[in-house]
Amino acid sequence: MTDLNKVINELGELGIYDVKEIVHNPSYEQLFEEETKPGLAGFEKGVVTTSGAVAVDTGIFTGRSPKDKYIVLDEKTKNTVWWTSDAAKNDNKPMNQETWQSLKGLVTKQLSGKRLFVIDAFCGANPDTRLAVRIVTEVAWQAHFVKNMFIRPSDEELQNFKPDFTVMNGSKVTNPNWKEQGLNSENFVAFNITEGVQLIGGTWYGGEMKKGMFSMMNYFLPLKGIASMHCSANVGKDGDVAIFFGLSGTGKTTLSTDPKRQLIGDDEHGWDDDGVFNYEGGCYAKTIKLSAESEPDIYRAIRRDALLENVVVREDGSVDFDDGSKTENTRVSYPIYHIDNIVKPVSKAGHATKVIFLTADAFGVLPPVSKLTPEQTKYYFLSGFTAKLAGTERGITEPTPTFSACFGAAFLSLHPTQYAEVLVKRMKDSGAEAYLVNTGWNGTGKRISIKDTRGIIDAILDGSIESAEMGSLPIFDLAIPKALPGVDPAILDPRDTYADKAQWQAKAEDLASRFVKNFEKYATNEEGKALIAAGPKA
């Protein structure tokens, strides 16, 4: 048993006093009872669905709130963090100590005198580099979410648990003084790296806790020479490891959940001297338009102990996965063992030999697959391109390009080139090959079928792409296969999907100019300038 007096004292050191009761690392059974209790109202209330999973709503925040993210500026962080600037805007906005103390006071006051859920867990499967994380919340389903998403400690590990980082979730409290403090709004997601504390106020979105700790791993690990990656990963029966980078909605979770391969994890990984390891103990899958036919493994994972967010639940308790009226970003979190085919007992494997960059190109320009040179690998990793099409966010009706460094700029705490350097070094050491895979659209106006994309991934993983005859795509100078087993050959060169190739040419020139403009921010040093040649020619 954990010594609860010790936990109470540690909370007191943070400023949380007069705790009525601590519910420490409750079982799933207890969490189910707690989050579906009669009398719960508003966003605290969980609804049991016919699958057995509980569904909750997160209110107006159905995604992260990057405009409300801050990091305390101090001696430790001033020269290490990739701070936002007018020249290159990002989400790492500096916060002074005075404002931090004020926000910390708001959250600790909110959590004081309450019955609290305290979850002690790990972020990172390797004992040497993992963060021991303590999450403190007054909301049962938030405790359920982090129990799903972080690595659950053994009883023995709990005995000697000493938190490196504490997440204090005060979703019920907002900041009345935000204007005077020069902040974006009354909501806040703030980090003090020196203190080892994350504060959340005003937003109920569960992903703030998950991605908050990812941002912290992205701070600590690359400084130790360990690659820290926004990617999914799996391993074949011969021990061959593949990693899949990509922004939200490009197919990381879907494509890495493969019946022929064991899943290491679906979103956050490190790569050290021993190989690739998961940061998490669960998966956080998008559920919009989910079906048993298209994604059987994820569909089956939605059962008791899974937690659905912002889905539409019908009168009879069934879920309408096609209904995006609350948000397109409907989600489910579940413990990783809800997927049958996973690496056990620890989510880690050897060095990666295949590195796949997923992009969903709504312009219809990029090929469904191309093999990258080492220079192109760095270029496309730093570019982190994808594009949204109508309907993914309010008010967007045409292709909108997103360039997100390292396929995860929102979570980078250090400068993007630091992640690129560490990744390319790891790839060099393991002899890994890199590929750019477009899961988006082509000249037909339709999205490339998941069947063709899976065929492409199979060809990469089984090595058959290596023996394919290759052609070259102009403007982008990308190497593209002329034929692959199980893939419609008519789609491999995107120009062939247009009735008139001049249409492709015009779109390609437009997209190339956007790549070039985006990359200007990296051309401030010799190394960045040297990579320009690896990109498209506008």
Curated annotation (Swiss-Prot):
Top enzyme category: lyase
CDD domains membership: PEPCK_ATP (cd00484)
Pfam families for the chain: PEPCK_ATP (PF01293)
Transmembrane parts of this sequence: none
Reactions catalysed according to its record: oxaloacetate + ATP = phosphoenolpyruvate + ADP + CO2
Location of the protein in the cell: Cytoplasm
Primary location group: cytoplasm
Binding site for Mn(2+): 211, 230, 267
Cofactor: how bound: Binds 1 Mn(2+) ion per subunit.
Recorded GO CC terms: cytosol
Cofactor needs: Mn(2+)
Binding residues annotated for ATP, in chain numbering: 211, 230, 246-254, 295, 331, 447-448, 453
Function field: Involved in the gluconeogenesis. Catalyzes the conversion of oxaloacetate (OAA) to phosphoenolpyruvate (PEP) through direct phosphoryl transfer between the nucleoside triphosphate and OAA.
NCBIfam families: pckA, PRK09344.1-1, PRK09344.1-2, PRK09344.1-3
Family: Belongs to the phosphoenolpyruvate carboxykinase (ATP) family.
Name of the protein in question: Phosphoenolpyruvate carboxykinase (ATP)
Organism (species): Histophilus somni (strain 2336)
